[in-house]
Amino acid sequence: MYIHSSKYLSYDDMKSSIERGEKMLQRKKIAVLGGDARYLELIKSLTSSDDLDILLVGFDQLNPGFSAVKQVSMNELEPTELSAVILPLSGVDEFGNVETVFSNKQITLKVDWINKLPETCTVFTGITTPFLKENVAARNLKFIPLMNRNDIAIYNSIPTAEGAIMLTIKHTNITIQHANVFLLGLGRVGTTCVQKFKALGANVWSVSKNKEDLARADVMGVTPLPLEQLSAHIHAADIVINTIPAKVLTKKEIQLMGSQAVILDLASKPGGTDFSFAKARGVEAIHALGLPGIVAPKTSGEILANAIKEML
């Protein structure tokens, strides 16, 4: 007599078991190396994907408390197994050192480690730096500077502009309403800053060398000012906000500014301001980097996570 035994799997059970095995084989290992408060939300969002294993380096001062997350050291991280590497938005310095906010340990990307990454690996960073250009992009790995994407930069410009407003309130003794705000550059960040400061009642001057930008500024209802004419008008500025990644606020312009004026430089390193001369002149100049991570890390992290998950 044939007796059915539970040790035999049904067709549906076998199919389900095979599918689970395939999913296990398809899991991707993602390494997150350093980062600021934005990356906490990024990590949380990535863990919602059931096909990702997240390896964290540079977060030893935190207990993220997320499933599918493991804290490891750089020595424990096997590059040949990685599907993606997520670097800080600031990239790395010329020696390959990674910025870490949640660790006191030095993390360094070494060339021989990078060379072991599989060709299918995607390397995410915020900006391109010389080290990354030479050692990652040149290897023909999929290399994605996130801040080069218009959608990310536009969304990110909102907390940047709000951060500029916060710093303006903190570092001046006047209201934004009726203040003379000179905004240098009308790119993604500059455009949002113009809109926000204008909405608060500031007298906004939009400064650019680009004729299309000047026309757009005029249409937006602010005062367009060619960059070459900046020195003739900058004496009227209460607040100068720079978004141009080139030296535009030199000794010539700064010495014409009032001593109570404040410079907020939002451009990436090294900025567009002669900070040494501003200090000697007694003009407060602030290089305000990473404002989204300070002002709205949760929102900024969600923006990054959505973009990265779309590309994985």
Model-inferred region functions:
Residues K70-E76, P224-E228:
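Short acidic-hydrophobic, aromatic-tinged amphipathic segments that line or gate anion-handling sites
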Residues D51-F66, A202-M220:
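NAD(P)-binding Rossmann-fold cofactor-contacting core
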Residues S90, T108-K116, M220-G293:
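Rossmann-like adenosine-cofactor binding region
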Residues I127-F143, A267-V295, T299-I308:
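Rossmann-fold NAD(P)-binding glycine/threonine-rich loop
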Residues Y11-K23:
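Short, Lys/Arg-enriched N-terminal segments with co-localized hydrophobic residues
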Residues D36, G58-D60, T129, K209-N210, ...:
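Residues in the short beta-alpha loop(s) of Rossmann-like NAD(P)-binding domains
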